Amino acid sequence: MSVRVARIGKPHGVRGEVTVELFTDDPQARFAPGSVLSIQHARGGRRGQGSAADAREPLAVQSLTVTGHRWNKDVLVARFEEISDRNAAEAARGLELFAEVADLPLEDDEWHQDDLLGLVAVDLTRGEARIGTVKALIQGSAQDLLEITPQGGGRTVLVPFVEEIVPEVDLDRGLVLVSPPPGLLELGEGE
């Protein structure tokens, strides 16, 4: 299994460097020289029909090997063995980069985003009563949110993914333990 770690942005200069939109918490490790990342075309990326991007030849490779990276203000600029000039950098624009899960070590209290999908959310304030199933993890600037599809159907519930409200994720049992403040789970009811 692989997880998305970044998306290639616009070219930076004429020597094949590209900007990178990050989806990882550890860019130093993911973009270390020698790291190999598999590629996929982004869904709904900038390669819209009729655009100049349509005329670009796609890269004829399935993976990219990192040769280096640097920071330009708060933007990661990366170099890859397979991208040697601005034309190749332009052809790579919009590609999504993936790393194998086995290459992404985790601490004891960490998990990959995809591991959360499909877990059963239970309410600790009601004796582990089933709330529903985790549908998505929505990443936000202030905090992440778990989108939970209620067991009985209806409108999805958004639960702040913070330790005070979600004290534990138990992958072995397939559970997300939720300790909601009064009224949180009722916000989506009645619509």
Curated annotation (Swiss-Prot):
Residue ranges that the Swiss-Prot or TrEMBL entry lists as coiled coil: none
Protein name as catalogued: Ribosome maturation factor RimM
Cited InterPro entries: PRC_barrel-like_sf (IPR011033), PRC_RimM (IPR056792), RimM (IPR011961), RimM_N (IPR002676), RimM_N_sf (IPR036976), Transl_B-barrel_sf (IPR009000)
Domain notes from UniProt: The PRC barrel domain binds ribosomal protein uS19.
Biological process, per Gene Ontology: ribosomal small subunit biogenesis; rRNA processing
Keyword Secreted attributed: no
Subcellular location(s) of the protein: Cytoplasm
Gene Ontology terms, MF aspect: ribosome binding
Subunit and interaction comment: Binds ribosomal protein uS19.
Taxonomic lineage from the root: Bacteria, Bacillati, Actinomycetota, Actinomycetes, Micrococcales
Top-rank taxon: Bacteria
N-terminal signal peptide: none
Pfam families for this protein: PRC_RimM, RimM
Domain PRC barrel, chain residue ranges per copy: 107-184
Cellular component, GO, one term: ribosome
Role of this protein: An accessory protein needed during the final step in the assembly of 30S ribosomal subunit, possibly for assembly of the head region. Essential for efficient processing of 16S rRNA. May be needed both before and after RbfA during the maturation of 16S rRNA. It has affinity for free ribosomal 30S subunits but not for 70S ribosomes.
Keywords: Chaperone, Cytoplasm, Ribosome biogenesis, rRNA processing
UniProt family annotation: Belongs to the RimM family.
UniProt keyword Chaperone, yes or no: yes
